[in-house]
Regions:
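Short connector loops/turns at beta-strand edges and beta->alpha or beta->beta junctions
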Residues: 27-29, 108-110, 165-168
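ATP-dependent carboxylate activation and anion-phosphoryl transfer catalytic cores
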Residues: 122-203
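Phosphate-binding site of ATP-dependent enzymes
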Residues: 43-130, 153-158
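Short small-residue beta-strand/loop micro-motif enriched in glycine and branched aliphatics
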Residues: 31-34, 112-115, 170-173
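Broad gene-expression machinery/nucleic-acid interaction feature
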Residues: 19-21, 72-74, 146, 159
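Active-site flanking residues adjacent to catalytic metal/cofactor-binding acidic residues
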Residues: 24, 64-65, 147, 160
Length: 203
């Protein structure tokens, strides 16, 4: 996990002693809401203005992290506990026309034209998959979701966030996209999620 801090009030920023660039996002939004190119923060003035604007707009604290410049992965997972398995790993690759450096709200909303999702299975992807599954199990997540990972400057995948209630739109949501690329039909994905929940309830 990258170094991080949480900002709710301007005074909180005074305590932040981290190396720039940093990355800012609301603590509890989905679909990239609040993430824009300005989320990559280069100095303290930007840190203050971006954080205070986010707190005001989204009415919640902001998480500040060391910016991770490497490859971004999202790992699909179905199942619970030791029965949790990866459905595949995709790399999120921003096209030239996309907003730079960040998997932003705009990039997600216009993913068909701005983002390439590539199913990957190289050593870095496998490392991301391993830690994503460990995070899923460690956090007690259930049935189906995603874990987002991004590599630091040394190529080490870092945990970014878990999505325990992911979007399941068959064409626009990341989890179904992963499954489709991995040869798992939408129907099978839904069946896996339901079967995991049924096993939990009737055991």
């Amino acid at each position: 996990t990258a170094d991080f801090a949480v900002v709710e009030y301007e005074e909180d920023i005074k305590k932040i002693d981290m190396i720039y660039p940093l990355f800012a996002k609301p603590v509890a939004e989905g679909t990239g809401k609040g993430i824009t190119p300005s989320s990559k923060i280069k100095n303290r003035d930007e840190l203050i203005s971006v954080c205070m604007e986010m707190v005001k707009k989204y009415k919640q604290p902001v998480i500040i992290e060391t910016f991770l410049p490497g490859r971004e992965f999202t790992v699909g997972i179905t199942g619970t506990g030791e029965n949790a398995v990866s459905t595949g790993v995709i790399e999120v690759i921003l096209r030239d026309e996309a907003e730079k450096d960040v998997y932003s709200y705009v990039n997600k909303e216009k993913c068909e034209e701005l983002v390439e999702y590539r199913l990957v299975n190289d050593s870095m992807a496998k490392e991301a998959e391993k830690w994503a599954l460990a995070s899923w199990r460690g956090l007690g997540c259930r049935d189906g979701g995603r874990v987002d990972m991004r590599s630091d400057a040394s190529g080490i995948p870092n945990f970014m966030e878990v999505n325990p209630l992911p979007g399941i739109h068959p064409e626009h949501s990341d989890l179904p996209i992963i499954c489709t690329k991995a040869g798992i039909s939408y129907q099978e994905l839904i069946e896996r999620i339901l079967n995991s929940a049924i096993k939990r309830i009737i055991r």
